[in-house]
Amino acid sequence: MAERENRRDRRDDRSREETPEFADRLVAINRVSKTVKGGKRFGFAALVVVGDQRGRVGFGKGKAKEVPEAIRKATEQAKRQMIRVALRDGRTLHHDQEGRHGAGKVVMRAAVPGTGIIAGGPMRAVFEMLGIQDVVAKSMGSQNPYNMIRATMDGLKRESSPRQVAQRRGKKVAEILKKPEAEVAEA
């Protein structure tokens, strides 16, 4: 009997260890209304970005009659929809990337150390929760926070590390990173 309890305790400890602590950022809150026979019913919609600041990020939206409940729902949805993004040196993107959603377009560029996060509004929240320290990003078209975050996530999903590229092509990482001889001769 005691052995079974010890096993259960170890399993509980392991599940607690595997659940990393997530940081969250509230991006937008909107007051929404529904017109009914007796008048208008007001509610709130929240947009939240959640990440572990080590390469995982997700976003969610929640709607409820009260603000805290909407934020809680959005946070839960964001935790369920997290994606993993390969980061170079744990601080920036591997390559320049473009993301689109609806009328929104986002261009993200890898940056040298010390650049910081040069991005506006909702994109900044995504990069901070992801753990990116150096990036230059520009949003074009739709300035709607939902579209901007979805376009940013679209671009991040396309991000791939040299290891992933090498695996797809059936080559070694050194072959992917190697410069062509023409460039080496000029340099």
Curated annotation (Swiss-Prot):
Pfam families: Ribosomal_S5, Ribosomal_S5_C
GO biological process: translation
Start and end residues of each stretch annotated as Disordered: 1-20, 154-174
A GO term for molecular function: rRNA binding
GO-annotated cellular components: small ribosomal subunit
Keywords: Ribonucleoprotein, Ribosomal protein, RNA-binding, rRNA-binding
InterPro entries in the cross-refs: Ribosomal_Su5_D2-typ_SF (IPR020568), Ribosomal_uS5 (IPR000851), Ribosomal_uS5_bac-type (IPR005712), Ribosomal_uS5_C (IPR005324), Ribosomal_uS5_N (IPR013810), Ribosomal_uS5_N_CS (IPR018192), Ribsml_uS5_D2-typ_fold_subgr (IPR014721)
Origin: domain of life: Bacteria
Domain S5 DRBM: 22-85
Subunit-structure text: Part of the 30S ribosomal subunit. Contacts proteins S4 and S8.
Family per record: Belongs to the universal ribosomal protein uS5 family.
General function of this protein: With S4 and S12 plays an important role in translational accuracy.
Domain notes: The N-terminal domain interacts with the head of the 30S subunit; the C-terminal domain interacts with the body and contacts protein S4. The interaction surface between S4 and S5 is involved in control of translational fidelity.
Protein name per UniProt: Small ribosomal subunit protein uS5
Taxonomy of the source species: Bacteria, Pseudomonadati, Pseudomonadota, Alphaproteobacteria, Rhodobacterales
